[in-house]
Amino acid sequence: MADELDDQAAMAQWASENPPGGGEGVNEFGDFSGGMGGWDDGGGDGASERILNQDEIDSLLGFDLSGDGSDDRTGIRAIINSALVSYERLPMLEIVFDRLVRLMTTSLRNFTSDNVEVSLDNISSIRFGDYLNSIPLPGILAVFRAEELDNYGLLTVDSNLIYSIVDVLLGGRRGTAAMRIEGRPYTTIERVLVQRMIDVVLHDLKSAFEPLHPVSFSLDRLETNPPFAAIARPANAAILVKLRIDMEDRGGRIELLLPYATLEPIRKMLLQQFMGEKFGRDNIWEGHLATELWTTQMEVRAVLDEQQVPLSRVLNMQVGDTLMLNATSRQPGGAARRRIPLTRGRMGRRNHSIAVRAEAPVDRRKKAVQKLK
């Protein structure tokens, strides 16, 4: 009993010397309580508690406040985004978009009559809702339809590229930055000029997909408010392609977003590897296969005669029965491979072996293959 009174007196003295909210006193009291917790654990009656600081909480939740632009996700955010399919699982996508960059470079040079350089900045996976919230405004969002895939895509043109294209097409001077007027909607002239550029990009996108699968892309509508350009659910995954367009000292960005639902009909084609100048072909393997086919061993049967007899006669056959054939020594027989006629010839004997001398060329026409089917 006296020990309990001594402990209570010591605790009261600590509380009077370290009032709540007192800076260093709180830390010392926290350390003391931690020590007592460890002493109580030894007795089996208490439990120690540790308060996480803000950095540890951010690390646990996966929030990166350093601003270094790293794409690595940790913590709960990594678990949430684990359902996203990486574009690297679709190897043909990178080939298609590389082809798109080359086509756009030529097309935009002809469209603007200026020196245009198109570069591929990044290809990544993102949730559609996160992308809508990250679109820089003001900008123009073009909703386009993939006819053969029966779905939609989204193309975003940022403000810098809009004013640069308008300035170039209307004869702006080189070496001067495009004039920007903020706080107003885009005019009809600006929207029409940007729409013409979008038509060029969609035509090049069609040509980029052509070797893989014919797809026609048609512009559906232009929007300036991201919620009105919703083509998928916020949680749906999509492929985001960022392109940089430079026209000497002017330029901007184009972002192309394709939901995975749009690419699903051609997903098997996107999974194949790129080989040679044509998609999915290997000339070395084709040559090897052709060589092996020429050396393939096949069984050929010589047919002397064919007759149709009743089933009852076949069932009553016994050892020693004789079958009369309607063939003579001068009548040509046939050579076949699994009932496919190959040639005709005469039956005879050569070096104590029965032989067939071919008297007609081997039928190389497609009829033989059709009979096999």
Curated annotation (Swiss-Prot):
A GO cellular component entry from the record: plasma membrane
Pfam annotation, one family: FliM
Biased composition (Gly residues): 32-46
Keyword Cell inner membrane applies: yes
GO biological process, one term: bacterial-type flagellum-dependent swarming motility
Positions of region (Disordered): 1-48
Cell inner membrane as UniProt keyword: yes
Signal peptide: none
GO terms, molecular function: cytoskeletal motor activity
Keywords, ordered alphabetically: Bacterial flagellum, Cell inner membrane, Cell membrane, Chemotaxis, Flagellar rotation, Membrane
Cellular localization per UniProt: Cell inner membrane; Bacterial flagellum basal body
Topological category with respect to the lipid bilayer: Peripheral membrane protein
Role played: FliM is one of three proteins (FliG, FliN, FliM) that forms the rotor-mounted switch complex (C ring), located at the base of the basal body. This complex interacts with the CheY and CheZ chemotaxis proteins, in addition to contacting components of the motor that determine the direction of flagellar rotation.
Family label: Belongs to the FliM family.
Name of this protein: Flagellar motor switch protein FliM
Organism: Caulobacter vibrioides (strain ATCC 19089 / CIP 103742 / CB 15)
